[in-house]
Structures are given as C-alpha cells and as structure tokens.
Amino acid sequence: MRRILPILALLIFISGCGVNQNTNNSNTESNAKSSSISTQDSSKMTKLDSHLTVAKQALSAGDYAKAIEEATASIKDNPNNADAYSLRGLATALNGDTTKGLADTKKAYDLDPNNVANYYNMAMVYKLQGQLNESKQWFEKVLEKDPSNTWSVYGIATIYADQGDDTKALDWLEKAINIDPSVKAVAAEQDHFERFHNNTRFKTLVGL
C-alpha cells in the first residue's frame, strides 16, 4: 500500500485540477450557447456536475466503489463525458480491475485527446498493471503540456527506481524535489526508494 496511497493522494489533486480546467473550458463554451440550452438540460448538467464532485470525493477517501458508482451515473447522464470515464477508469483500476480501468481511460482519451489529467490517470493505470514503459510514456505526455508537473516527474523517478536504473531514478527525483520540496517526505516513505536508504545521494536529496 505504501507504493500506491501516497501517490494516490497527490494524484487526486492533479486529477481534480485537470477536471476543473476542463469544466471551466466547457463552461466558457456553454455560456456562448446558453440561449439554446433548455431548463431541463441545465438541470441535467447540474446533476452531472454533482455526480462528478461526489465521485472525486469518494476517490479521495479511498471509496472506489462509490467513485465508480457516481462516475457511472455521470456517464449515464452524458455518454460523452470524458472526465467521468477518466475518473471511473482510475477508480476501477485502484479497485483491482486494471483491464476495465484502462478501457475507461482509453475511452476518455478517445472523447477528449487533450485532457492532460487523463494522461496522468492513464499513466497511473498502466503503472498499476506493471506496464512501466507505457506508464512512463504517458507521464512524458503530461510533461509535454506541463513541464513542471511535479508528480509526473516523480512518477518517472519511481519507474526508473523500479526498473533498477538508480542514476536516472535519482536524477528525476532531484528534478521533482526542485519543483516541490514536499516530494522529499513522500520519497522517504515509499517502497520504490526503500533500497536507496543507504545511498548517500538519496539521503542528501530527501534529508535522511
């Protein structure tokens, strides 16, 4: 669990930001079309947003079943809701079914290939599957759009650590710490870096 939960807590922050950004973009577009939206459609959108909010809260609390249920309700209201597919995919993968989780995040990508939050979620699902090279590629896609995305940089560091490439693992860990020093505490506790605890460079980086 120490390999997943610290990342999850940070992941939810990033996923939430991504969803909020997409929602803001959608709201801007919706405002331009407001004259053509009926009261019924507006009510449905409010309900949809509520489902997503509850789903994110459930995911943050580790209640994956509830997150899946609420994201599914969002999809029922709007079958083209990329954010809901992405969130459901991550929750499903964390709940143990990485195959279904990956299918949902891929569906989210098909619906909205520019959703950077979904890139991160796909990276995490691939990571949960043990497909580290694929995971790294999606973290890299996040960094193409957001070069200072701390937890994608850190994600790549953990992949190199798991693959036994110590030099690259520490190089990427240093990059992540330079962006956000709070990474130190996470790295010091995670199993990815447990074997590094006697490594002089690692101890210097995280302050052990």
Indicate residue ranges for each PLM-predicted region.
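Position-specific recognition of the canonical hydrophobic site in helix A of tetratricopeptide repeat
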Residues: 59, 86, 92-93, 127, ...
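Structural marker of alpha-solenoid helical repeat scaffolds
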Residues: 77, 111, 145, 179-180
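Alpha-helical segment of the N-proximal tetratricopeptide repeat
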Residues: 44-83, 94
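Structural signature of tandem alpha-helical TPR/SEL1-like repeats
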Residues: 61-70, 94-107, 129-141, 164-172, ...
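Canonical tetratricopeptide repeat
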Residues: 87, 121, 155, 189-190
